[in-house]
Amino acid sequence: FILGFLTVANFIALIAGAQVAQAAADKPLNVLVLYADDWRHDTLGAAGNTIVKTPRLDALADQGMRFTQNCVTTSICGVSRACLYTGQWMSRNGCEGFNMFTTPWEQTYPGKLRENGYHVGHIGKWHNGKFPKQNYDFGRSYQGKHWFEGKDGKKIHVTQRNENDALEFLKTRPADKPFCLTLAFFATHAEDRHPDQFLPQPQSMKLYQDVTIPVAANATEESWQRLPSFFDEKNEGRNRWHWRFDTPEKYQTMMKNYYRLATEVDSTCGKVLDELKKQGVLDNTLVIFTTDNGYYHAEHGLADKWYPHQESIRVPLIIRDPRMPEKKHGSTNNDFTLSV
């Protein structure tokens, strides 16, 4: 099992074609895409990060394959998402920002799978124009804030809302159809208009209290000064660096809350996988974890993403394929892979 230069979206789309050729007695593979936000390649224990706690995603890597050199083609939220859904570069899919891509829906992986009899759902962040709810059997899109007002009038965290909706999808899906669910988290994206930026759930605040998160060797004024002249103090990446990282105290506060959000996403991924196991379908489900782009943690004197440094374009990719030989479980693939 080697993905090599086969890209993620086209890999998913191939599942649809393969199901048509399967014998009637075989069960088509379900597809679960766990799609995080602003999460770079090394925000995983499995990737060697000794501070962030991601036990459920680490376990997923132990049961599948982790791709160490996976990159997005464009490190911009909406564009990167369009590339994943369509399997096409920005120059072909027509999305140059946050608009709806021009590629026909039937050519996207949700479209292909639904056309082939799948029960298809999307939960969480969309970010490509108006959410096309009519194209999904189960569609709930929301983003932009860490806290929402719930049905009972109480506040609910966006990651908890993601979890509730994902479990509802799995518990209410028709048992006689395969499913494809894209669970698109808003965390670990910052709430840009909020002074605290990263707002985890109260129970997570005890995490990372007693650690000091190291600052990268290239998170220096010298690294900033080496950038081309069009990187000035008006640059949005530099502006957001001031929001988040321009003092040692601010860096520690922001990074700890960022990691808390990551651990919450990890927990929700685990709850969803537990439900699949409870239903007896985990070993008939292709599970993919990846993200829309990386993230500067003050490297080069920047924050956020957008530019072609590894911190910005290199993202995690874990694939758990039940057809994978057991000897491949827990392996890594160092081939160059892309999100288109």
Language-model features, listed with the residues they occupy:
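Catalytic-site neighborhoods of secreted/periplasmic enzymes
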Residues: 83-174, 187, 191-201
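Active-site-proximal N-terminal segment of extracellular/periplasmic enzymes that hydrolyze or transfer
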Residues: 22-65, 74, 97, 114
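Extracytoplasmic/secreted proteins, especially bacterial periplasmic and envelope-associated proteins
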Residues: 30, 51-62, 66, 80-83, ...
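Bacterial N-terminal signal peptides
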Residues: 2-17
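Short phosphate-binding/catalytic loops that engage adenosine nucleotides
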Residues: 65, 118, 281
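Active-site-proximal cap/lid insertion segments
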Residues: 26-29, 38-51, 145-157, 171-177, ...
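Short, solvent-exposed turn/loop segments enriched in Gly/Ser/Thr/Pro and often Arg
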Residues: 46-51, 65-88, 99-102, 122-132, ...
